[in-house]
Amino acid sequence: MPVRQLPETIVNRIAAGEVVERPASVVKELVENALDAGANRIEVFSDGGGRRRIAITDDGGGMTRADLELAVDRHATSKLDDEDLLAIRTLGFRGEALPSIGSVAKLSITTRHTEEPHAWALAVEGGTKSPLVPAALSQGTRVEVSDLFYATPARLKFLKTDRTEAEAIREVVRRLAMARPDVAFTLSGEERAPVSWAAVLPGAAGRLTRLSDILGAEFRKSAIEVRSERDGVVVEGFAGAPSLTRANALGQYLFVNGRPVRDRLIIGAVRAAYADYLPRDRHPVLALFVTCDPHEVDANVHPAKTEVRFRDAGLVRALIVHALKDGLSREGQRSAAASVDGATLAAFRPGFAPPPRANWDWRRSPSYPIAGSNAMDMAPGFAEREQAGFDVGLPSADVRNYAAPAAELIDRPLGAARTQIHETYIVAQTRTGLVIVDQHAAHERLVYEKLKASMASNGVQRQLLLIPEIVELDEATVEQLLDRAEELCSFGLAIDSFGPGAVAVREVPALLGKANAASLLRDLAEHMAEWDEALPLERRLLHVAATMACHGSVRAGRILKPEEMNALLREMEATPNSGQCNHGRPTYVELTLSDIEKLFGRR
């Protein structure tokens, strides 16, 4: 077959295959056009998941008659000069969207330019353009797309259900609305109730309002403002506290010069910034806005313009990590503390508790110490100190003499310890309510931060064992541990081979005290087996520190004296990131006096 020039309609349909993948792609292109036209209000309507009908109405500048006639021709655009391809400042620039849509659907455009006496309308069907006719429209542009892919029916079978396609449209509009909080958006359709986002004032407060309207009130409560700048590149936005997480990274949004993009860059940078706060299977919610010179970013690397390429991707990644780490550190405990939400409070409502039993005596309850018992009997396997008469089995009212809160302690952020319950949780009184602390999770974070600080300064202090502890493990585990012996040694854990299937532990970190060496080594080996070989040394060392901290912290079941509980609270207040343990769980929750009064019907 000889080489021949393809007809314009076929060329446009080929281009449409790249630009118009699904109804959401049409909405994206048309809303971007509206934003580029200076619209202050945009209305989006869809029917049948967008395949039957899509309508976009805006109050932008509109088009003249001459511009409208050219707009549906391929590569006709008002947004790009001859030499501006590397300095793109608009969302659209190729001039492909309208001709591509018109080649696979029925397209109708009605527009009125501010200098025109009336509006003009133009229809395109299957790539065939009809003559322009006068029309009625007060301002801006209205674009309607119907029977999407009627000219390429094979594409229809690749579309999903109407509900799924409608949700994809919703996500596109949500992203564009987050990018432009100064523009009002309305989204409606046969598949959904109308949703509106009012325009807000520029600045951080307005941006947070728009993000909260879209991401929910929970995001507003936990949002931390972040910002970092260097060499003309600015990263700013809002990140959710570590207490607000998702099972996937779909709640992470990146915008570059006002353009919503998807980039693996953000996933790795966010993971690095939140590494000390979240478990590996949880992801934070955030929206980051990168602003830079258009020459520093290439937006022309993907047909749908959903990806960009930075001239200095390493700089952008470093700024994202720095902005997030700085914000999380600056917010400290506020970003980490978990509060009691309404659902939890509802569980306390009268009627949930079982009725009291007649003739019940707390002395016969399982928690009351039996004569002759001691701390070791109550919590086997844990080394205890002298309890100095501190009876954990007694009701909390009977220990108030030991834990009476001094006025100065109540005014501290975590208050004054009142008692310990279930040998696991510390209850502290604050000026505005109470705090419940998970003693193991809290102490785990403290030990972890001490290990990191020691590693960063003069190295972790070691404790030489008079008699090396021999730990028997399977040969594969032994080999794995010995391969990482140098990394373990940097944290004060010195091990040597002790024949087949065994290692000798000669030194342990002084911070760990009497931690079970065998259990520690087994856990370390399990975690090492999950490591990616490409994982940086720093991250591997932090994983080691986190595992060691877990084994070196106060366990649930350990009875604490009042002075020990208060000392733990004070150390938490002075330690960064103490609101989460190393696995991302909260170390304490707050219950305000207002919450307590609600429980008893006082409010």
Swiss-Prot record:
Disulfide bonds listed in the record: none
Keywords: DNA damage, DNA repair
Biological process (GO), any one: mismatch repair
Pfam families with a match to the protein in the record: DNA_mis_repair, HATPase_c_3, MutL_C
InterPro entries: DNA_mismatch_repair_CS, DNA_mismatch_repair_MutL, DNA_mismatch_S5_2-like, HATPase_C_sf, MutL/Mlh/PMS, MutL/Mlh/Pms-like, MutL_C, MutL_C_dimsub
One cellular component term from this protein's GO annotations in UniProt: mismatch repair complex
GO molecular function term, any single one: ATP binding
Family affiliation: Belongs to the DNA mismatch repair MutL/HexB family.
PANTHER family: DNA MISMATCH REPAIR PROTEIN MLH, PMS, MUTL (PTHR10073), DNA MISMATCH REPAIR PROTEIN MLH1 (PTHR10073:SF12)
Protein function: This protein is involved in the repair of mismatches in DNA. It is required for dam-dependent methyl-directed DNA mismatch repair. May act as a 'molecular matchmaker', a protein that promotes the formation of a stable complex between two or more DNA-binding proteins in an ATP-dependent manner without itself being part of a final effector complex.
Listed name of the protein: DNA mismatch repair protein MutL
Organism of derivation: Rhodopseudomonas palustris (strain BisA53)
